[in-house]
Amino acid sequence: FIKIVELINKLTIIIITTIALVFNFDVYGLIFAYIAAGTLVIVLKFIYILKNKLFEFKFVRVSRKMYKSIIIFSGWNMVALLTQRLTYNIVPSLLGFFSGTAEIALFTIALSIEGYIWTFSNALNGLFLPKITKLNIDGKTEEINQTMVAVGRFQLFFMGLIILGFYLLGPEFVNLWVGEDLEPAALVGFFLVVTGLFTYTYGIAYTYLLVVKKVKYYALSLIISLVITLTSAVFLIPHYGALGASIAIFGGNLIGQVIIMNIFYHKIIGFNMIDFYKKVHLRSVIPMAVTLVFGIYIKQLIEEYSIKNLIIKIMLVSIVYVALSFIFVLTK
């Protein structure tokens, strides 16, 4: 129920933003709508928790070993969470030092888009924790792998549509949203999210890391990603501004969160990542490639920027992508 409420909240935010774009609401009305939606979600969660008695406090003696285990796990988890978002807080400062306010504005718009997409990608996180925990206790490793493939396909289907759609129609969306001058923010945003075609499909693998208390490997990969990002950003930002910053983040994410995490998953955790990519990503190549070509054709066919034309393009691209995905991915 809580995950469903969170997903509804995220959808509501997107709908509110779209309505604001169409009817030209002022910023105060938009902020009030966001606050109202967030408050409603908090109230619904609180009522659900009280009604179902999800928490019960018992004061019992806890062993030192358990304390140590909790502290270590919580520590690595905190490092992972902080490092994950630290990049996006440091990079604007580098942009201000090496480039200027114009590039910060571009990056801020791109970061807003990345935030929305990241929020959607995490809608299912934690939902399978009870199931994966039980399968691990029962020693059913093969079923965990099967669940990872099934959830990975769904995540790639859903997030693939969003990321591919943003690549095709992002410039038009940004143009209509914030104006022609900030349209380059679309390409900046694309580099921030494109590695999500891989990382967003690792939800079950990350959940398994939590279950077996090996989240430190995820934290280490994020630290490596952060170091690579900041090092390369210092060299790229003076020449390419916000685009250079996004390319630096792309490189850090690709090496740290994709390549290195795949090594951890395959060698240390024991997941067959090659088989995973064959069953998830390889099957999605045809739907994505055909949709990409079709989307480019539609953009050339309907060149004028308008809310109406953007909605038409989104619908056409979505129909083609969903139809092909059902044929080649979801029904197999």
Tell where the protein language model's regions lie, with residue ranges.
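Short runs within selected transmembrane alpha-helices of multi-pass transporters and secretion channels
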Residues: F1, V5-T17, L30-I47, A80, ...
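Helix-loop interface residues and adjacent transmembrane-helix termini in multi-pass membrane transporters
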Residues: N24, F98-T101, V211-V212, H239
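Interhelical loop/hinge segments that connect adjacent transmembrane helices in multipass membrane
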Residues: V27, K45-Y88, L127, K131, ...
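Hydrophobic alpha-helical transmembrane segments in multi-pass integral membrane proteins
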Residues: A80-Q84, L164, L230-V234, P287-E303
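Hydrophobic/aromatic end-of-helix segments at the C-terminal termini of transmembrane alpha-helices
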Residues: T87-L95, S99, F128-L129, L169-V174
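Specific pore-lining/lateral-gate transmembrane helices of multi-pass inner-membrane transport
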Residues: L106-I223
